[in-house]
């Protein structure tokens, strides 16, 4: 899988529609195939500025939106015709329920739901300096043992944290950076001086 997803909370509407699509895909035994169809649709949505504008615009009628979404689905060469039909019907439901503006979020939430069903997670790592491959492997191994699944590391370097790491996995954050420790020390010293010590 090219993408993995963290556990950062999504809007409830996105989650509910994504879960409904996931449940349908599971019932039909088409989770992986539908995931590819969603990926194809999202690629078109990301690349077509007119379609992006259309999806976000409140100025089109539901009838026009249904027609355009059907046309878009007809023109995407889905790997599996059944998955394309399920996605097309799902887009129709979203459109009829006036949720087209949430389309991108819903489809990304579906991808995330599929990744979670495979126990795949994404961790954001901020380091003061680049990690070597051994450090990356150790960190990945520790995080995988914590979550009980596959963890993909997204590592960025920020020299401003001075040292240590900031790890974000889902809604949790572990901050072992030197900057955070200095900030804590500063607060403790201010408190002590305010207390008269």
From Swiss-Prot:
Enumerate the InterPro entries for this protein.
ATP_synth_OSCP/delta_N_sf, ATPase_OSCP/d_CS, ATPase_OSCP/dsu
| Protein keywords | ATP synthesis, Cell inner membrane, Cell membrane, CF(1), Hydrogen ion transport, Ion transport, Membrane, Transport
- Keyword Transit peptide present in the record's keywords: the answer is no
Give a yes or no for keyword Membrane in this entry.
yes
What Gene3D superfamilies does this protein's entry cite? N-terminal domain of the delta subunit of the F1F0-ATP synthase
Membrane topology is: Peripheral membrane protein
GO annotation, cellular component aspect? plasma membrane; proton-transporting ATP synthase complex
Gene Ontology MF term list = proton-transporting ATP synthase activity, rotational mechanism
Main location group:
membrane
Location in the cell reads: Cell inner membrane
Which Pfam families does the UniProt entry name for this protein?
OSCP
- Source species, domain of life: Bacteria
Entry function:
F(1)F(0) ATP synthase produces ATP from ADP in the presence of a proton or sodium gradient. F-type ATPases consist of two structural domains, F(1) containing the extramembraneous catalytic core and F(0) containing the membrane proton channel, linked together by a central stalk and a peripheral stalk. During catalysis, ATP synthesis in the catalytic domain of F(1) is coupled via a rotary mechanism of the central stalk subunits to proton translocation.
Its family remark reads: Belongs to the ATPase delta chain family.
Record note on quaternary structure: F-type ATPases have 2 components, F(1) - the catalytic core - and F(0) - the membrane proton channel. F(1) has five subunits: alpha(3), beta(3), gamma(1), delta(1), epsilon(1). F(0) has three main subunits: a(1), b(2) and c(10-14). The alpha and beta chains form an alternating ring which encloses part of the gamma chain. F(1) is attached to F(0) by a central stalk formed by the gamma and epsilon chains, while a peripheral stalk is formed by the delta and b chains.
Q: HAMAP family under this entry?
A: ATP_synth_delta_bact
This protein is called ATP synthase subunit delta
Q: What is the lineage of its organism?
A: Bacteria, Pseudomonadati, Pseudomonadota, Alphaproteobacteria, Hyphomicrobiales
Q: State the gene name recorded for this protein.
A: atpH
């Amino acid at each position: 899988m090219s993408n993995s997803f963290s556990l950062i909370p999504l809007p409830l509407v996105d989650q509910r529609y994504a879960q409904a699509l996931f449940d349908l895909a599971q019932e039909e035994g088409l989770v992986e195939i539908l995931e590819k169809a969603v990926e194809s649709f999202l690629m078109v949505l990301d690349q077509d500025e007119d379609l992006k504008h259309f999806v976000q615009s409140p100025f089109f009628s539901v009838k026009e939106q249904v027609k355009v979404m059907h046309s878009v689905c007809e023109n995407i060469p889905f790997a599996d015709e059944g998955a394309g039909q399920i996605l097309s019907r799902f887009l129709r439901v979203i459109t009829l329920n006036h949720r087209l503006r949430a389309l991108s979020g819903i489809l990304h939430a579906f991808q995330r739901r599929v990744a979670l069903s495979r126990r795949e997670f994404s961790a954001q790592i901020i380091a003061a300096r680049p990690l070597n491959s051994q450090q990356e492997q150790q960190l990945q191994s520790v995080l995988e043992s914590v979550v009980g699944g596959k963890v993909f590391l997204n590592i960025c370097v920020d020299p401003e944290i001075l040292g240590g790491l900031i790890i974000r996995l889902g809604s949790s954050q572990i901050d072992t950076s030197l900057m955070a420790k200095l900030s804590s020390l500063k607060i403790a010293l201010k408190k002590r001086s305010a207390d008269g010590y």
